[in-house]
Every structure is written in structure tokens, then in C-alpha cells.
UniProtKB/Swiss-Prot annotation:
Ribonucleoprotein listed as a keyword: yes
Protein name from the UniProt record: Small ribosomal subunit protein uS12
GO biological process, one term: translation
CC terms in the record's Gene Ontology section: small ribosomal subunit
Subunit structure: Part of the 30S ribosomal subunit. Contacts proteins S8 and S17. May interact with IF1 in the 30S initiation complex.
3-methylthioaspartic acid: modified positions: 89
Amino acid sequence: MPTINQLIKKPRKSQKEKTASPALQNCPQRRGICTRVMTVTPKKPNSALRKVARVRLSNGFEVTAYIPGIGHNLQEHSVVLIRGGRVKDLPGVRYHIIRGAKDTLGVNNRKQGRSKYGTKKPKA
């Protein structure tokens, strides 16, 4: 426990708040170019082939982003828009690709939760 005099000489440092998505640099989304599209396997109790992409962002960061939904059209050099949001069972994946923006198409035959997957309203 420091004395009052010690605190006058050297005050306490306020703790910096850590951000969950540092590559966005306080922006809601960032544009990037896919450098690699691949599948990865999740952590222990789960089993699947999750679709992810390595993305070089417009600010120079290179991040791994998850591709949500069933099926996608992404390949190398596709331009994508990413947002924050981690995938709990994929270590190191802290970003999501936004479906229906830039080169990413929306999910086909999606009826519910369409706004999250960039799908247009079906014709009645």
C-alpha cells in the first residue's frame, strides 16, 4: 500500500480498456480482400468444418473472419466487408464477414433471419 507522498510523486495509472476487435480501430466495419479461403475444425466438444477466410484489411491488418450461413461464393481476391464478433469454438476468429455486401452474396433460400444473411425478401 503506497503512502500519500508516494502517490503524489507517482499517481496511479488508469487501466486501459481492451477492445474485442482491435483491427477495426473503432470503426463499425472494415473493407478487406480475401487472401485465403479455407475450412477449420472447432474446439473440443464440437465437430464440423467451419468456413473462414483470411482477410487483408484496408488499414493493413490481416485477420481471420468467419463466413456465416450455408454456402458461399468467396474466393481469393474477393472484396468483403467485415464486422466484429467472435466465433466461440474457433480460436483466433474474432470477426464476421457481412453477407450481401461487396463481393459476398446472400444466402440462397433463406426465409427467416434474412437481414443477417443478406437475403432479399422472396416474391409473394
